[in-house]
């Protein structure tokens, strides 16, 4: 997999003592770990001690996430009737409001430039501006257009960006200081 060498690169920062430990942490076979470390050395990303080189640090820093866009405009029809009085992003799960947990996770990772695309009950999100320093983008067409339109409205802010749905709950912080590839947070798997 082309993603594995970068996973190895990130994990090698965690100072794994052996390739076996790295294999267990990444869930890749020992053979793939060995081959990937060899490739990373040949490409100049790690040295003979499996430590990051200046080239690797520069690449990681250039590609680290700069901001986040949280998509929160929709009606959330799958959650009716729960969300008819409150937007789905503001529902409390395990003692925390969904969107606040996402924002806190982003802040823990150093992401403070956060845009929230709102529509349905948009006024309910205004407290986030003062409390967390987010910026709101209004999607007035939320009732008949989907998340792609919300993302279009935020397109000028895309730059090494996390794009996150507002109605997820993660036990552990899913965000990282370094990401070499864009990804959209969605899964049908339970943590």
Feature-to-residue mapping (PLM):
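Short, small-residue-biased leader/transition segments that mark boundaries at the very start
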Residues: 2-9
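Conserved N-terminal catalytic core of the sugar/cofactor nucleotidyltransferase
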Residues: 10-67, 96-163
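Glycine-rich N-terminal loop/short-helix segment of MobA-like nucleotidyltransferase
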Residues: 21, 59-92
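Conserved core of the sugar-phosphate nucleotidyltransferase
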Residues: 46, 171-191
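Glycine/Thr-rich phosphate-binding loops of Rossmann-like dinucleotide-binding domains
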Residues: 78-79, 124, 171-172
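Short amphipathic alpha-helical segments
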Residues: 81-84, 127-130, 174-177
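Structural signal for conserved beta-strand scaffold positions within catalytic alpha/beta enzyme cores
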Residues: 92, 138, 184-187
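The conserved acidic donor/metal-binding loop of glycosyltransferases
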Residues: 166-169
